[in-house]
Amino acid sequence: MEGRLFLIGVTMGLYTWKSRSLKKNGGLDSPLRRGLWHGLFCSLAASAAALVLSVSMEKHTRFVFVGPNAFAASEFYPSIIAAIVGFVYGFFRGRAEPENKRGYFLLEDSEWAETVFSAVLLAATIMYFIVQAFKIPSGSMENTLLIGDHLFVNKFIYGLRIPFTGKRVFNFRGVKRGDIMVFSFPDQDPRDVHCGSVQYHRDFIKRVIGLPGDKIEVRAGQLYINDVPIKNEPYAHFSDGELRQPESVRAFDLSPKKYQELWQNHELDGILQDVQRDFFGPVVVPPNSYFMMGDNRDRSCDSRYWGPVPLKDVRGKAWFIYWPPARMGTVH
C-alpha cells in the first residue's frame, strides 16, 4: 500500500508543479487546454481513489496481470476505468467553464493536488519507515493472533529500509527466534501456486522459528532445531489429532541435496503436497533468511511449504493489538 501511496503523491506533486508553470506562461488560457488539464486532474484523482479502494477491499483471491512487477488486475482495471471516466467528466466540465469563473477549476485542482501530495507522502513515509496497521485475515496464528485482530507493525526495528534496494540502515536489533514478523511472500513468480492459491505479493504474518544456519526438521509433528526437539512451546497450537501423512511417503525418495534445493526455490510443496506439514526436512536455513511457522501448526501455510523468507522481504515486527479493545496489548 505504501508504494501505491508514494506513487500517488509523486504524481500529484508533478501535477502541481506543472500547473504553476503552465499558468505562469499562459499555457492554460484557451478553453480547450483548460478542459484537457482539468480532465487530467480528474483522471488522476479518480484512478488514485479507485486504486486505494481496490487495494483496501482486495479479497484473498488475486488475478495476476501480465508480468511479475505489474499491478494485479483487480487493481489495474478499476483504476483505468476510473481514469477514463474522470478524464471525460473533467474535460467537458473544464471546457464549459464560464468566462466569469475562468481558472476557478484549475485553482481548485492545484490546491487539492498540493494537499494530496503533502498528506499522501507523509502517510507513505510513516507506513514505509515507521509503523503500519494490519488486519489478521486467517487463523494461522491462533491462539496468539485471532481472525479480525488489528495490530500495528514496527517497521524500523530491524533497520530502515532503503526504497527499491532491499537494503537496510540503522539496524536497532537483529531478528530473534520467536519474533512475530510481517513479510511479503518470498516467491517472486506471480504464476506460482502455493497452499492451493496464488500467494504472490501478499503480506504474511508468522513466527520466526529458524535463524540463518539452523537445521530444521519436523518428525511426526515434532519440531527439531539443530537436532534438538523443541518441547513445551507455549504458543504452539495443534488443531488436528492425527498425522496427515505417514513418514513412509515423506520425501518421495528425494536426496537431501535435492530436497534442500526444491525448498529454497519455493518448489517443494508442488511435489510433496501436504506431506511436509508433519514430516519435513531436514533443511538448513540459508544466509540472511528465516524459517517461519504459524502458531496454529496444523492450519498454517508457512516455510514448510514454500521455503525461507529473505530479510529483504521482511516488512517489520508485530508490535501492538489495538482492536478489538478486549484484546488490546503487545504481541509476544
Where are these regions (language model features)?
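N-terminal Sec-pathway targeting helices
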Residues: 108-116
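Hydrophobic membrane-insertion alpha-helices, especially the h-region
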Residues: 115-129
